[in-house]
Every structure is written in structure tokens, then in C-alpha cells.
A protein has these predicted regions:
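Short, conserved catalytic-motif segment at the N-terminal edge
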Residues: 1-40, 60-62, 76-85, 223
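Short secondary-structure junction motifs
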Residues: 2-4, 58, 62-64, 142, ...
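Alpha-helix N-cap and coil->helix boundary residues
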Residues: 4, 62-69, 175-179
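A general secondary-structure junction signal
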Residues: 9-11, 71, 197-199
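Active-site SXXK
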Residues: 13-14, 39-67, 161-169, 245
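Short, surface-exposed loop or secondary-structure junction motifs
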Residues: 18, 78-278
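Acidic helix-start/capping segments at beta-turn-to-alpha-helix junctions
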Residues: 68-77
């Protein structure tokens, strides 16, 4: 009971195969395929991590440098405690911690502490508009950044890679759209991928669907994404196609990542062994 799905696999020898099912949406019978553009949500994070590691490779930053030296705004993001109070962080934050989800930044849907601190819309499960103030750290998704533990002391899936996107912009002097296009998408020939894509691609975009918590029925979700973004969230704002994203993955599998970066090896082995019961 889903409108569409595209499955694909890539191998080291360059082989790819895709299987597609369904139509563009529950309201549009246009067939989908490997060239259909989607909003790829958190699959954006792997691209942002690659961009960050390119800057490590260039010597602009080291994985374990305190980022507050280049991004002092991090000092202002306090730790949200279980009783709802805030306190100052004890430790500086590193790029490694932002990329491996040990920085303390969380999403409202991964942290009960944050979920309790904001009001959620019962119809969507997302924060109400008044709970999503504009901020200068990490735009585009969820709530104003909160940390729930000190950097390096635990693990939680969250907004750290999005914050890393802000660091990339600060270090490179370019916005994420410009940087990733020039340094990742164009070198790999990913012509149907970007934060801002052509109007032709926007017209082909597969819309999101929502399932009613009351009836279980699917419907096309309102498109809240502007046709052109002015600010770019490294944790989830990219548009891409299955074929383009497979090109990115094949690059990593074949070792062609060396043409984009060498520091990928620094994050290829596990960087988090265990926290708590993990």
C-alpha cells in the first residue's frame, strides 16, 4: 500500500540494476524509474560528510579540532537536561563528533527530552510552527538546535551532520549548494542532484505522502519545500534520483572516492564502539 518504490543495487565492478514499481503519486499515474527525482531526506548526510572530509583532506580543519575556534556559535548551544533546564557544555565539539552522532545534537523524534520541550502537532507529529523559530545554526528541519549531552559522552541520531554543513560553509566560504555542486556532483556527473535543481526536475519530483493516523489512508502531503532554497540544510535538503545516488555510492565502493577525498578512510572504520546499551 505505497504509491511507488525504486530498488537498485551497485557493485564494485560498476554494475547497476534498478527495479521500479508504481506511479509518481496516488494522484498522478506517471510511471516512476531510476531517473525520477526524489527529496532524499537524510541520504543527504552522506554527501555532507563527504564534503566535510574534503575539507579535512585540504587541511582546512582536522577531525578532532575544537570547532568553536572557527564556529564560535557552538558555545551558545546549551545542554537540555531531563528536568527541562539548560546548562553550559563542558567540552568543545569536533567535526568527528558531528559526523558520527556523538555531539549531543538530537531530533525531537529521537529524543524524548526534546519532544517534551516542544509542542507537537497531533495531526502530523511535527512541532507546531511557533515551536520552530528561525535560527542561525541549522536551518530546514525540526526545532532550534538543542543538545542533550556533552560532546563525546553518548550517541544519538540527530542534527549533527546538519551543523557540520554550517561548518563547511564557514570554512569554504561557499554555501552548501555551490560547494557540493562544484566538488561532488559535477565531478561525478550527477546532473540531476542538488539543493536547487531545474524547474524541469521540480515538475517531475515525486511528492511525499502522509498516512492518516485515524484512517490509515495515504494522501499527497502539502509541498512545504520552496522551489528555490536560499539556505541549505546538510542533513536532509537534497533532491536526487536513484540513478544519480547510485553513482555516488558506486564511487565509494570502487575506491574512486580517492578522486574526491582520501580522508574517507578516517571515517570508514567504526568510530563509535559502544555507548550505554548500544
Amino acid at each position: 500500500d505505497i504509491p511507488n518504490i525504486v530498488l537498485g543495487y551497485v557493485t564494485r565492478d560498476g554494475s547497476t540494476e534498478f527495479l521500479s514499481y508504481g506511479s509518481l503519486s496516488s494522484e498522478d499515474p506517471t510511471p516512476i524509474g531510476e531517473d525520477t527525482p526524489y527529496m532524499i531526506a537524510s541520504m543527504t548526510k552522506a554527501v555532507t560528510a563527504t564534503a566535510a572530509l574534503q575539507l579535512v583532506e585540504s587541511g582546512a580543519v582536522a577531525l578532532d579540532d575544537p570547532l568553536e575556534e572557527v564556529f564560535p556559535e557552538l558555545r551558545e548551544v546549551q545542554i537540555l537536561q531531563e528536568d527541562g533546564t539548560l546548562r553550559a557544555p563542558k567540552h568543545p565539539t569536533t567535526l568527528r563528533q558531528l559526523l558520527n552522532h556523538t555531539s549531543g545534537f538530537a531530533y525531537f523524534f529521537t529524543s524524548p527530552v526534546i519532544a517534551q520541550a516542544v509542542k507537537l502537532d497531533p495531526s502530523s507529529g511535527f512541532p507546531l510552527p511557533e515551536e520552530v523559530p528561525e535560527d542561525r545554526y541549522d536551518w530546514g528541519f525540526g526545532i532550534q538546535p538543542r543538545r542533550i549531552f556533552d560532546a563525546g559522552e553518548d550517541w544519538i541520531y540527530g542534527r549533527g551532520v546538519g551543523v557540520a554543513g554550517r561548518v563547511i560553509e564557514r570554512l569554504s566560504g561557499e554555501d552548501l549548494h555551490t560547494y557540493t555542486k562544484a566538488n561532488i556532483f559535477e565531478p561525478l556527473g550527477m546532473s540531476r542532484t542538488g539543493y536547487n535543481v531545474s524547474q524541469e526536475l521540480i515538475a517531475q519530483l515525486a511528492p511525499l505522502h502522509l498516512r492518516s493516523p485515524l484512517t490509515g489512508e495515504l494522501s499527497v502531503a502539502p509541498n512545504m519545500r520552496p522551489a528555490r532554497l536560499e539556505r541549505f540544510y546538510g542533513g536532509g535538503d537534497l533532491i536526487s534520483t536513484p540513478k544519480d545516488y547510485a553513482t555516488f555510492l558506486r564511487c565509494m565502493l570502487k575506491g574512486l572516492a580517492a578522486s574526491l577525498l582520501c580522508s574517507s578512510l578516517a571515517m570508514a572504520s567504526p568510530t563509535v564502539r559502544s555507548f550505554g546499551q548500544l
